[in-house]
Amino acid sequence: TLKNDVLMSFLTQSLDKVYLESVREKEGGSYGVSVYGQLSRYPNDDEAFLQIYFDTDPAKREKMTQIIMNELQKIAQDGPAAEHINKTKEFMLKKHTEQMKENGYWLNILNQYYWYKADMDSNFQQVVESITPEDVKQFAKALLEQNNCIEVSLCFLRL
């Protein structure tokens, strides 16, 4: 649904802000943490995934991974900061206004409607404006309650 897509965007953007503060600025553990979320509409409307990745010193990997999981759990327990929600709303509404001038945006809207009968535009502004920290909290909680987490670490050999 449009609301779930918007909630995923709010969650990923809130995590981006939190990880910038905790992992990069406070711990100096990485230049940046990338967060990507996606909802699947095929074959079901009820599948989602959240991908979080970062580079770090191998000696800091465990600590940084723990910080990343703790921050995600904190949002699922307490919700994101109201400031993050407000900044995300402002950003999303501004970006939407800009995207509405682009053919690619409308092609995607038509594609979503054709394949999934999903109207991803008509109520966009109202949905974005209606999102609360509690909504994002419940969304994050539902993701974590799936208890379906995979951790992958890649360590490169130096020759």
What residues fall within each predicted segment?
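Mature hydrolase/peptidase catalytic cores and their serpin-fold inhibitory cores, especially
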Residues: 129, 133-141
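Extracellular/periplasmic catalytic domains that process cell-envelope and extracellular macromolecules
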Residues: 143-146
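Short Ser/Thr-interspersed hydrophobic loop/turn segments at strand-loop and sheet-helix junctions
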Residues: 15-16
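Carboxylate-rich, divalent-cation-coordinating active-site regions
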Residues: 21
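M16 family metallopeptidases and their MPP-like homologs
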Residues: 1-5, 9, 24-130, 148-156
